[in-house]
């Protein structure tokens, strides 16, 4: 290294500039290597030489020198580093006449700052210490007061330092601020601009007192300012400070906003466009960063934006005043406009377009409106009423960039309607505006500018998707514009693609009749685009063709449609048979031609067979088989009855092989296609392939993919129903498919559509009565399968088998059915508990399907099992009796009600029975009709049991009341409301719980009868009894989760109640004397936990109605709670809030930092048991996830206190590794997936 450095030093002194260049270049390359080590003997010489070369006459040498100094600063001793800083600073401050040296020295210092480590280090501290005083001299020195270039260079360097090390420069910030603030008055705009950037970077890390003094100075300056340039600079400074410091500016808005609003619309300065633009940009920053505090001013800002988005004094549109009916606009259109540096001219004198900067004002208005649209979902209806018309009337904007911004703003407004909590009224307002909107945008569809057309199409695409079916009357206008884009020669490819996508969306979403007059022109353009050489245009055109054919099929009349279809088919066929085309085109061609064959196959008979042959080839191709299978299904199901005999046997053979492929989509599609074949054309299924198909089908019957299993069962059922050789099919099904089916019945995972299709299959099998699968044989197999289930057996173990037994029994002959029921009844007296459980389950499943009350000893035998020793048997017996009553209500319900009255020991089980009956009957109109006459007998009994001491019993009663209340709401809901005033807290608790079970019933009934009374039920949130209050909180949480619209408009009432219940109440903490020691019992834990669960739910369903500030105050209470569960719940709420309304969370983040710090620093006692240690570790991990979610919020790094919290509490502690691991996780892994709906 010494030899190398010696050579480099020698070459750097060469008189040949090329040698000097190569020497500095080689040195820079070496310095970039991690292995480079500076030789102490050469260090001083190298530094000295490099500093001397900053004045080199060759620019490329200077550039290399700057690079070397930036890399060298970290590798030299402090004394040499100081020399580098001092020399470069001296070049700037003392060599002011040498402009090139000043410039290169400034670049050198900026390069050094860039190369310094980001974290505070000794070298960084040294550079800051040496450089800041010199920069301040350069900015403020009297000697350099006329040297603007030096001031700008120093401000640039200082800004870089503040940006990178602001939080490490706290001690210097006050001096820097004192020096930089006066530069806001500088005569040169470039100096003012750099001063603003510096002040914004000072504001970010500055302590509160310094930040306050900065804002006080600026506000006072605005109040005293007279010149528009000075005012404009101060307002620009406020905007910049707001962007860097966010919510900290919020408390100053009452002092700031009146001035900004005034100057934005002040007639005195109406000729100063820059001032107006800066006001609007300031609004944008404030709206984004101070969402809560800016609320009182939003209305005025909207008014100003809608006014100045039309501000175009150099251009007069005579029709605009009439169209908008806006007098203000007419005034603005006749006003004059002055450049900022010119003297004030006469008002009537217009400027040339070259001097016109009014477009900046219109563009700034767009940006501010975008900020409002993005951050104020609660104003969506108002925005559509007030802003949308202004926007679409400005689609004629003459400046293209502004016009595109207006399009973007309107698209953003449209996208708000897709948000979960968007007010549906806004969509209705938009629908009324569609005619004018489309009329305005249609002009842009035929604009000469490609960018304008693409922007207009993007807007229309969004509109079609937001309000599908609402553009019926405007389709012609849009289609005319699409036709123009598709027909023009040399049209931009992107424009064609976008036009095709829009056409596809229109065809999918708008009524077919809307396209009646455009069929011929559209078909011509589609064919042309299908033949386009660019694969993206061709593939999109094929997708459009598919939708076009569907629309054409709906509106074709007796007129000859063959020419159009033939042309489309021919274009599709060319792409279908082509071998050397893109995969995207291949798939689109297969899908499109499949649709043509499906709907118009009779019109192209002569071309059909060659096409089907190619489709068979595509089916055998690994790349195209999935889409071809789907197309084959469509063709099979065609109403035209396409002759597929030439390809179907080969296709079936291929489909059967696909069933074993490790491709779920292919497997699923193949099963659907095989199903379609056995339904539509079973005779084309060769018997020779049946064994292979059913062998493959048997492998699909398992618990690993129940959707595939469901399709397999459906295929087997359709095969047995439709195949001509039923005996052969039944024999193979029995041999291949019944064994895996019986094995699946042992799985507790079998449920949903797979179970339903299996039950349907068993019903079909029994009705066929084929040898080997007769009723008695199936029954034996099912009972044997049940016997094979491992102990211990529960009712869930027999859930599927009992339903299968019930289905085959219901579908067999009456004689066999009666015998089976008799045997099941006899089994109830067995000592074999699993057999008793299975028999009870079977009787219940049979009884809820058909009336079996006439079977001897049924009621007595089932009721006797209520006395069994096994609790599981008693529970199943209760459900069995309830199920039997479903179809035998007249016979069984009076008995059940009588026993509830007279058998207190069996009352709990009998109430389960009653609930089972009510639940099953309330799901169908017929069931409701059946139970209605018994309401007068049931209700008194339920009301009597509302005061039962057992909470489980009261919950059953509440469910019954809730279900019944929706059967006869007129009568029952008033009775429930009356019971709210009951003196019994247990009865009040039961009544408020009942509404949980009401709200999931018929929506119309809930809205008509329950909604008007919901506030009366929830008045029990104020109840003095803890049990009642918790029941009310649980009901509120359930409503918030499932029917939030019932309470959304009253959250201002319910949220304070939740916040109050979330606090630790000393009066609910009691001391229990346990002899040797005393123990504190907190009776309010469950209340608090339920309140927080409800708050968590509301964050998901009603966040737009929540004022975040008091919500966070309550969150702080939760973070300080003594219960781990509540702390974990609060962490989840922070995560959910960070994801859904991060800006509002940041405005109040400082409240959360101390409680989070306490949690993260918590250590368990040395005597703590393992469970306590694990719970504390879990709580810390959860808190770290919450902090990580906050750190992911955009601009969270601008919150100084949060950054300091992360640094001091996490980054510099043993928690750092764990926190970094959480940060590196995918954001989705931190989703708050907890379900708190009770």
UniProtKB/Swiss-Prot annotation:
Annotated InterPro entries: ARM-like, ARM-type_fold, CAND1/CAND2, TATA-bd_TIP120, TOG
Answer whether the UniProt record assigns the keyword NAD to this protein: no
Q: Using the UniProt record, give the first listed, main subcellular location.
A: nucleus
Ranges for region Disordered: 315-354
CC terms in the record's Gene Ontology section: nucleus; ubiquitin ligase complex
Q: Where are the HEAT repeats?
A: 41-78, 126-167, 171-208, 210-247, 251-292, 382-419, 432-469, 603-641, 646-683, 688-725, 853-890, 933-966, 967-1004, 1008-1045
Where does this one sit in the cell? Nucleus
* GO BP annotations, alphabetical order: protein ubiquitination; SCF complex assembly
Q: Which UniProt keywords apply?
A: Nucleus, Repeat, Ubl conjugation pathway
Identify its protein family: Belongs to the CAND family.
UniProt function note: Key assembly factor of SCF (SKP1-CUL1-F-box protein) E3 ubiquitin ligase complexes that promotes the exchange of the substrate-recognition F-box subunit in SCF complexes, thereby playing a key role in the cellular repertoire of SCF complexes. Acts as a F-box protein exchange factor.
Protein name stated in the entry: Cullin-associated NEDD8-dissociated protein 1
Originating organism: Dictyostelium discoideum
């Amino acid at each position: 290294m010494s030899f190398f450095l010696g050579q480099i030093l020698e070459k750097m002194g060469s008189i040949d500039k090329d040698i000097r260049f190569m020497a500095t270049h080689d040195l820079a390359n070496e310095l970039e290597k991690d292995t480079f080590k500076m030789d102490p003997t050469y260090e001083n010489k190298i530094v000295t030489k490099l500093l001397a070369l900053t004045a080199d006459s060759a620019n490329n040498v200077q550039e290399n020198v700057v690079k070397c100094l930036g890399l060298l600063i970290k590798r030299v001793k402090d004394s040499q580093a100081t020399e580098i800083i001092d020399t470069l600073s001296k070049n700037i401050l003392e060599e002011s006449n040498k402009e090139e040296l000043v410039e290169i020295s400034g670049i050198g210092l900026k390069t050094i700052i860039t190369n310094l480590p980001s974290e505070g280090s000794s070298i960084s501290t040294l550079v800051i210490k040496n450089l800041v005083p010199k920069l301040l001299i350069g900015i403020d020195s009297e000697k350099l007061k006329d040297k603007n270039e030096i001031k700008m260079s120093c401000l640039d360097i200082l800004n870089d330092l503040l940006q990178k090390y602001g939080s490490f420069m706290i001690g210097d910030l006050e001096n820097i601020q004192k020096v930089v603030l006066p530069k806001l008055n500088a005569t040169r705009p470039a100096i003012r601009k750099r001063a603003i950037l510096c002040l914004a970077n000072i504001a970010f890390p500055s302590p509160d007192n310094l930040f306050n003094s900065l804002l006080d100075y600026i506000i006072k300056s605005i109040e005293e300012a007279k010149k528009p340039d000075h005012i404009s600079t101060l307002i620009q400074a406020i905007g910049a400070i707001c962007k860097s410091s966010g919510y900290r500016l919020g408390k100053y808005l009452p002092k700031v906003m009146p001035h900004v609003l005034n100057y934005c619309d002040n007639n005195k300065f109406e000729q100063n466009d820059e001032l107006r633009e800066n006001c609007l940009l300031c609004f944008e920053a404030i709206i984004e960063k101070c969402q809560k505090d800016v609320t009182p001013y939003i209305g005025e800002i909207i008014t100003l934006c809608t006014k100045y988005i039309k501000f175009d004094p150099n251009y007069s549109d005579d029709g605009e005043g009439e169209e908008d009916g806006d007098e203000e606009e007419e005034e603005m259109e006749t006003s004059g406009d002055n450049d900022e540096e010119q003297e004030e001219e006469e008002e009537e004198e217009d400027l040339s377009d070259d001097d016109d900067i009014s477009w900046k004002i219109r563009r700034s208005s767009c940006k501010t409106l975008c900020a409002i649209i993005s951050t104020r979902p609660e104003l969506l209806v108002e925005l559509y009423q007030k802003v949308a018309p202004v926007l679409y009337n400005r689609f004629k904007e003459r400046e293209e960039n502004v016009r595109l911004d207006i399009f973007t703003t309107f698209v953003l407004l449209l996208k708000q309607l897709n948000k979960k909590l968007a007010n549906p009224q806004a969509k209705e307002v938009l629908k009324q505006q569609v005619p004018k909107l489309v009329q305005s945008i249609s002009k842009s569809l035929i604009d000469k500018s490609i960018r304008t057309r693409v922007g207009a199409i993007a807007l229309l695409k969004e509109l079609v998707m937001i309000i599908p079916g609402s553009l019926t009357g405007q389709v012609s206008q849009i289609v005319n514009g699409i036709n123009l884009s598709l027909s023009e020669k040399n049209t931009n490819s992107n424009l064609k693609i976008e036009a095709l996508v829009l056409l596809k969306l229109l065809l999918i979403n708008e009524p077919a009749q809307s396209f009646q007059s455009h069929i011929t022109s559209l078909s011509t353009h589609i064919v042309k685009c299908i033949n386009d050489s660019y694969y993206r245009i061709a593939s999109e055109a094929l997708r459009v063709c598919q939708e076009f054919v569907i629309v054409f099929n709906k509106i074709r009349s007796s007129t000859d449609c063959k020419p159009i279809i033939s042309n489309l088919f021919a274009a599709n066929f060319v792409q279908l048979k082509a071998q050397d085309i893109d995969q995207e085109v291949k798939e689109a061609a297969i899908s499109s031609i499949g649709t043509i064959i499906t709907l118009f196959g009779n019109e192209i008979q002569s071309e059909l067979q060659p096409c089907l042959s190619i489709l068979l080839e595509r089916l055998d191709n690994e790349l195209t088989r999935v889409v071809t299978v789907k197309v084959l299904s469509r063709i099979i199901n065609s109403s035209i009855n396409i002759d597929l005999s030439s390809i179907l046997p080969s296709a079936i053979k291929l489909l059967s092989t696909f069933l074993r492929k490790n491709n779920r989509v292919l497997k699923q599609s193949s099963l659907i296609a095989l199903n379609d074949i056995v339904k539509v054309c079973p005779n084309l299924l060769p018997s020779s392939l049946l064994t292979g198909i059913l062998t493959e089908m048997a492998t699909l019957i398992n618990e690993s993919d129940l959707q595939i299993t469901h399709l397999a069962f459906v295929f087997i059922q359709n095969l047995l129903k439709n195949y001509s050789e039923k005996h052969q099919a039944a024999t193979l099904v029995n041999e291949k498919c019944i064994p895996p089916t019986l094995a699946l019945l042992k799985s507790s995972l079998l449920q949903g559509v797979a179970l339903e299709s299996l039950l349907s299959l068993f019903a079909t099998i029994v009705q066929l009565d084929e040898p080997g699968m007769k009723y008695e044989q199936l029954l034996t197999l099912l009972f044997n399968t049940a016997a094979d289930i491992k102990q211990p057996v529960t009712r869930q173990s027999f859930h599927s088998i009992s339903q299968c037994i019930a289905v085959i029994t219901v579908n067999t002959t009456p004689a066999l059915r009666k015998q089976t029921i008799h045997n099941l009844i006899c089994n109830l007296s067995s000592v074999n508990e699993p057999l008793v459980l299975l028999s009870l389950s079977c009787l219940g499943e049979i009884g809820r399907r058909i009336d079996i009350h006439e079977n001897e000893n049924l009621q007595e035998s089932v009721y006797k099992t209520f006395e069994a020793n096994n609790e599981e048997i008693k529970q199943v017996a209760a459900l069995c009796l309830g199920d039997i009553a479903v179809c035998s209500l007249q016979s069984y319900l009076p008995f059940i009600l009588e026993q509830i009255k007279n058998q207190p020991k069996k009352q709990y089980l009998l109430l389960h029975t009653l609930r089972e009956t009510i639940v099953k009957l309330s799901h169908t109109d017929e069931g409701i009709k059946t139970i209605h006459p018994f309401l007068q007998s049931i209700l008194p009994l339920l009301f009597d049991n509302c005061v039962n001491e057992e909470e489980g019993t009261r919950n059953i009663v509440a469910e019954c009341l809730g279900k019944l209340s929706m059967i006869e709401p007129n009568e029952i809901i008033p009775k429930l409301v009356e019971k709210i005033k009951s003196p019994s807290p247990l009865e009040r608790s039961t009544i408020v719980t009942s509404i949980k079970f009401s709200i999931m019933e018929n929506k119309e009934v809930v809205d008509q009868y329950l909604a008007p009374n919901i506030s009366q039920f929830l008045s029990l949130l104020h109840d003095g009894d803890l049990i009642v209050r918790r029941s009310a909180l649980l009901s509120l949480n359930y409503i918030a989760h499932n029917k939030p619209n019932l309470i959304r408009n009253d959250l201002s009432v319910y949220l304070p109640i939740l916040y109050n219940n979330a606090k630790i109440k000393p009066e609910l903490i009691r001391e229990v004397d346990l002899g040797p020691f005393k123990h504190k019992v907190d009776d309010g834990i469950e209340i608090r936990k339920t309140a927080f669960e409800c708050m968590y739910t509301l964050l998901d369903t009603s966040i737009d109605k929540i004022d975040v500030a008091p919500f966070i105050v309550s969150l702080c209470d939760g973070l300080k709670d003594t219960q781990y569960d509540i702390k974990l719940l609060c962490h989840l709420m922070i995560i959910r809030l960070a994801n859904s309304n991060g800006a509002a969370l940041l405005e109040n983040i400082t409240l959360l930092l101390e409680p989070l710090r306490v949690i993260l620093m918590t250590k368990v006692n040395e005597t703590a048991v393992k469970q306590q240690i694990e719970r504390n570790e879990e709580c810390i991990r959860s808190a770290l996830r919450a902090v990580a979610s906050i750190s992911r919020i955009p601009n969270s790094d601008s919150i100084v206190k949060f950054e300091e919290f992360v640094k001091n509490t996490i980054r510099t502690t043993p928690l750092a590794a764990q926190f970094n691991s959480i940060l590196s996780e995918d954001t989705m892994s931190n989703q708050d997936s907890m379900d708190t709906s009770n």
